[in-house]
Amino acid sequence: MSKEFSRAQRVSQQLQKELAVILQREVRDSRIGMVTISDVEVSRDLAYAKVFVTFFCVGEQTPETCLAALKEHEVPVRMMLGKRIRHRLTPEVRFTYDNTLVEGMRMSNLVSDVVNTDKRKMAESGRTESDEGEE
């Protein structure tokens, strides 16, 4: 029977949970705002963890400023993580901004705009959607 998940995937899931707790309860920095960990990728040797984050920015905060502030906490976060997990080696944590949500929303808006434009043009020309299928 083969393993359903590799060790790296299991460690990745554990790190995601622990890092979420650490960022929520331990890291006190108003420049960061609300952080969501969308994914954690761990190297095969478990030495490095690439942590994908998104931010809910308030006021003048931007994802770039929030990420810069969060990167200042990489070493202390790694130390806190080492105390919480029982591994021989605590992975080196690297925070990366995850723009997939923003890009997905942008693409969805573009598709909606195109559909609305097509409907408007069809209405202006006096055609209906059922006329389209008959051609």
UniProtKB/Swiss-Prot annotation:
Record carries keyword Cytoplasm: yes
GO annotation terms (biological process): maturation of SSU-rRNA
One GO MF term attached to the UniProt entry: ribosomal small subunit binding
Keywords, comma-separated and alphabetical: Cytoplasm, Ribosome biogenesis
Subcellular location field: Cytoplasm
Source species, domain of life: Bacteria
GO cellular component, one term: cytosol
InterPro entries: KH_dom-like_a/b (IPR015946), RbfA (IPR000238), RbfA_dom_sf (IPR023799)
Role summary: One of several proteins that assist in the late maturation steps of the functional core of the 30S ribosomal subunit. Associates with free 30S ribosomal subunits (but not with 30S subunits that are part of 70S ribosomes or polysomes). Required for efficient processing of 16S rRNA. May interact with the 5'-terminal helix region of 16S rRNA.
Subunit structure: Monomer. Binds 30S ribosomal subunits, but not 50S ribosomal subunits or 70S ribosomes.
Family: Belongs to the RbfA family.
NCBIfam families to which the protein is assigned, alphabetical: rbfA (TIGR00082)
Identification of the protein by name: Ribosome-binding factor A
Organism of this sequence: Aliivibrio salmonicida (strain LFI1238) (Vibrio salmonicida (strain LFI1238))
Protein encoded by which gene: rbfA
